[in-house]
Amino acid sequence: MSAAPRSNKMAIIMSCFAAFGGFLYGYDTGNISGVKEMPYFQRQMGNLQPDGTYALSSGDNSLITSILSAGTFVGALCASPLGNTLGRRFGIIAGLVLFCIGVGLQTGGKDLAIFVVGRVFAGLGVGVTSCLVPMYQSECAPKHIRGMIVGAYQWMITIGLLIAAIVVDQTKDRNDLGSYAIPIGVQFAWAIILAGGLVLLPESPRWLISVGKDEKAQVALARILGVAPDSPVVAEEYAEIAAQIHHTRSLGSTSYLDCFKSTNRNRLRTFTGLGIQALQQLSGINFIFYYGTQFFKNAGLENPFVITIATNVVNVGMTVPGLLLVDRMGRRPLLLIGAAGMFVCHFIVAGVGSGVSTDNQAGQNTLIAFVIFFIAFFAATWGPLAWVVTGEIYPTATRGKQMSMSTASNWLWNFGIGYATPYLVDKAPGSAGLQSRVFFIWGGACVLCFLFTFFFVPETKGLSLEQVDILYRKSSILGSNKVRKEILANNVFDDDKEAYKSAKTEAQTEHKEDVKMRDL
C-alpha cells in the first residue's frame, strides 16, 4: 500500500505566519532610531542645551536604546520554561501580552522613567517571541525548505524595520505626543494579529511528543502534513521524532547543566548557538539601525531619515536572495561569503569615513554606498542564517533551553553594543569619538565570523531535525557535508524508529478492530 501523498501547504502557512513575530522585533528595533531624533521627543525627554535646543545625553541615549535589549535578554531566558510548559504557541502569546504592556507604557508615558519601563516590558515580550518563533518554525517546517521558512523570520524583521522607518518619517514633524505615540502605539495591531492567528494553528508536534501527548501530536502532524491521522506518513514522521527524543533522554537528564556536557556533543552545539548569535550582533548591523539616523546626520547628509529608509529597503530586498539560496547552496557557503563581504565593506567605510571630510560629496557617497553593500551582504547571509542554524542544531529534548540561551546571547550582545556605541562614536567628553573608525571594530569581528563558520558550523541542508542530531554524532564539523550526503543517500535514522513505527501501527490496527467489534 503506498503512502498517502503529503501536502506542505499547512506547514508553510503556519511557519510563515509565525514569522510575523519577526515583524514585531524589527518594527520595535527600527522605530527607536528615528523616535530619538524627533524634535518633540527630545523636548519631552531631553535636556535644555546652552543654545536653547533640547537633546538627549549620551547616557539617556544609550539607556533608551539598550534597555530594550536588557529586557529581551531576560525574556529569552524565560522563553524556555514558558515554551516547555505552555507549548510553543501559547508561550509566544504570553510574550505578546508582556509586549503589549510595554507598548502601552511607552505610548502613554510622558517622562523618561515611564518610557524606559515600557521599553523593558516590550523587551521581555520580544525576547520570548524571538526565541520561540524560530523554534516553532523549525519544528514544523518541511526539511527541504526549512532554511527558507526559518529565514523568513529574519525577512519579517527587515520588513518591520522598513515599515517603522516609513511611519517615523511621516510623524517626525508633528509637534505633539502623536509624533512618537503613533509609531509606537501601532504595535498593538501587530501583536493582536499574531496572537489571533496562533490560536488557530496547530501546536508543534515535537513539543507534544516530548511531553507525552502522543495522540495530539499525531493530529498536529496530520494537519501539518495534510493527511489523515492514521496515514502511514504520520506514522513515519512520528516514529522518527519519538526515536530521537528517546535517544536523547536515554543519555541522561536534560537540565541546563547538560547543555554544556560533552554527551551527544551538546557542549559544541551550545557553543555554536551562543557564538553565531553573538557574532551576528558584532557584525555591526544594529549600529546602522539603532544609530544610523544620527550617524548619517553627523556625516553631513541633509535628510538622514530618507537614507535610513533606503537602507531598510535594501535590507528587505536582499534578504530574499538569501531565502532562495539557503536550501540550495547550504548554510556554510553563504555564511562564509557573507563574512568576507561584510569585512571588505567595513574597512572601506572606516577608511573613507576617517580620511575624507564631511564636505567631500564623493567621499560621503562612497561611504553611503558601502554601508548599503554591507547591509546587502548581511541581509542575504548572516541575517537569516543565524536563526536558521540555531533553530536546527539542537536535539528536541534540550532545544528549548539551548535556543533560549542562544537567543539570550543575541540580546546580551545587542544590549552591550547598543549601550557602548554612543560612547564609542560621539565626540562628547568621556566618549571615544571614533565616529567612522568604529567600522574597524565591526570589520575585525567579521574576520571572527569567517573563522567561526569554518570551524564550528556544520552543513545541515536537506536534513530533518532528527537527522541533524545523527550528523552531530557521526561527523566532525569539517567533514559534515560529506556525512550529510551519506545520511540523505542512505536515509539514515535512529535505530529506535522502526520500533516506534511498529508500535503505532499495531495500536492503530487494534483500535480499528475494536471499532469493528463495537459495530457488530
Enumerate the predicted regions with their spans:
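Alpha-helical transmembrane bundle of multi-pass membrane proteins
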Residues: 1-225, 229, 239, 243-520
